[in-house]
């Protein structure tokens, strides 16, 4: 796009990933990126390409996705939120919009990304949350899960928790927060890192579930991390329990937060 009169906008986006084959645009199946770009292009009256903070997989949800795009269109601020939402299905919504400096980049400007994984831990399944939570009927020992999770804090080689087809050049990531707690019949895993490998969060959760059902001995997560071998870890937890809840940026960008991020993610 020619630099003259180009504006850069950041948008906060939430979506129910149950209806899409992930974030990334694909040729045949529906994607969140495609739907958003279509809606933005209608408002701008020219083709819009967007960049996101984190490319979520099929079935993964978000209340904190951040995207940016560039445009030569001169529109009211509300056109990029209310206007765009009028062309989106009810399971995708723009929740805030802000004009940013041209050097802002949704992916590369991000400092950390935070995810929440929610498990419905009850003997009987839920009819309401089938596509929103992962149901585990066996009682989970949350204290054990949280204890083992602390071995993953800090900068490590997370080869044991990356997908076999992960294309990242380096397996090293820095986890700054990893908490496991129970709220009635819900078990929640909160995790924050500079960035994540493909399936990293779901592979960590899958391994912590094995700890929670007492299938593995104490310090297993520590040993697993040191092995650097995916084949020794637990199964990948289902996508439906995973939410991208917050992306942190330098304060000078002054980006808004989702209205209920502070409630949903502590």
Curated annotation (Swiss-Prot):
The gene is truA. Keywords: Isomerase, tRNA processing. The keyword tRNA processing applies. Its EC number is 5.4.99.12. It comes from Buchnera aphidicola subsp. Acyrthosiphon pisum (strain Tuc7). InterPro entries: PsdUridine_synth_cat_dom_sf (IPR020103), PsdUridine_synth_TruA (IPR001406), PsdUridine_synth_TruA_a/b_dom (IPR020097), PsdUridine_synth_TruA_C (IPR020095), TruA/RsuA/RluB/E/F_N (IPR020094). It comes from the Bacteria. Formation of pseudouridine at positions 38, 39 and 40 in the anticodon stem and loop of transfer RNAs. GO terms for biological process: tRNA pseudouridine synthesis. One of its GO terms (molecular function) is tRNA pseudouridine(38-40) synthase activity. Belongs to the tRNA pseudouridine synthase TruA family. This is tRNA pseudouridine synthase A. NCBIfam families: hisT_truA. The active site is at 57 (nucleophile). It catalyses: uridine(38/39/40) in tRNA = pseudouridine(38/39/40) in tRNA. CDD domains: PseudoU_synth_EcTruA (cd02570). SUPFAM superfamilies: Pseudouridine synthase. Homodimer. It holds the Pfam family PseudoU_synth_1. Substrate binds at residue 115. The lineage of its organism: Bacteria, Pseudomonadati, Pseudomonadota, Gammaproteobacteria, Enterobacterales.
